[in-house]
């Protein structure tokens, strides 16, 4: 987990510097405070999954950019604030196919709000085990084991486990071609 945190902080700093951006400019683009971004870059703070999505969206890079070190076969992100969500990259972003694929586990009672992705992003969610409540653009639906949905992910979407057991689901995210 420590290697992942170091990888995340290094990657964030490299992406910011490649663009020639200050922390203030990065804060404007992501909606994350300059102080928090600085703490993440210095590896003094671990971002929540929601914060990491904001950063990825603001930088216009796939989420897996931050959790897929080249030498790691199964990188995971654990949400330290919720202490209830684990995201594992099954297939990191593929620039030729323009998608990434995650396995996600959420403990009972966990909730995660995802900010809108860039225009044209499509997300597929399939429940592997348990029951998932999903809200897309204000409309809630419940998905049971074996059920799935595809939606435009350029709107706010919320994942919630209202059940008594951990829910396990896959998220396949398609990005528009550049």
Curated annotation (Swiss-Prot):
A Pfam family cross-referenced in the UniProt record is HTH_3
Task: State the UniProt keywords alphabetically.
Answer: Activator, DNA-binding, Repressor, Transcription, Transcription regulation
Which stretches are labeled DNA-binding?
23-42
Which CDD domains does the UniProt record give?
Answer: cupin_XRE_C (cd02209), HTH_XRE (cd00093)
Per its record, how is this protein called by name?
Answer: HTH-type transcriptional regulator SutR
> What gene is this protein a product of?
sutR
Q: Which PANTHER family match?
A: HTH-TYPE TRANSCRIPTIONAL REGULATOR (PTHR46797), HTH-TYPE TRANSCRIPTIONAL REGULATOR SUTR (PTHR46797:SF23)
Listed under GO biological process in this entry are:
negative regulation of DNA-templated transcription; positive regulation of DNA-templated transcription; regulation of DNA-templated transcription
Reported induction: Negatively autoregulated.
GO MF annotations, alphabetized: DNA binding; DNA-binding transcription factor activity; sequence-specific DNA binding
> Which lineage?
Bacteria, Pseudomonadati, Pseudomonadota, Gammaproteobacteria, Enterobacterales
Q: What does this protein do?
A: Regulates the expression of 12-16 transcription units involved in various steps of sulfur utilization. Represses expression of pfkB, fliZ, cysE, ydcO and its own expression. Activates expression of ypfN. Acts by binding to SutR boxes.
Q: Which organism is it from?
A: Escherichia coli (strain K12)
Pinpoint the Cupin type-2 domain residues: 105-171
HTH cro/C1-type domain location: 12-66
């Amino acid at each position: 987990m420590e290697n992942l945190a170091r990888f995340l902080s290094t990657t964030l700093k490299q992406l910011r510097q490649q663009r020639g951006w200050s922390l203030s400019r990065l804060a404007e683009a992501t909606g994350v405070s300059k102080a928090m971004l600085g703490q993440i870059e210095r590896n003094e703070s671990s971002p929540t999954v929601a914060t990491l999505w904001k950063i990825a969206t603001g930088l216009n890079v796939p989420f897996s950019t931050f959790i897929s070190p080249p030498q790691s076969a199964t990188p995971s992100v654990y949400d330290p604030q919720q202490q209830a969500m684990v995201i594992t990259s099954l297939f990191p972003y593929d620039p030729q196919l323009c998608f990434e694929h995650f396995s996600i586990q959420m403990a009972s009672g966990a909730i995660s709000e995802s900010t809108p992705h860039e225009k044209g992003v499509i997300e597929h969610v399939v429940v592997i085990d348990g029951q998932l409540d999903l809200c897309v653009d204000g409309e809630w639906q419940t998905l049971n084991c074996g059920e799935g949905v595809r939606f435009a992910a350029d709107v706010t979407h919320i994942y919630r486990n209202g059940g008594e057991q951990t829910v396990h689901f896959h998220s396949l995210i398609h990005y528009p071609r550049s």
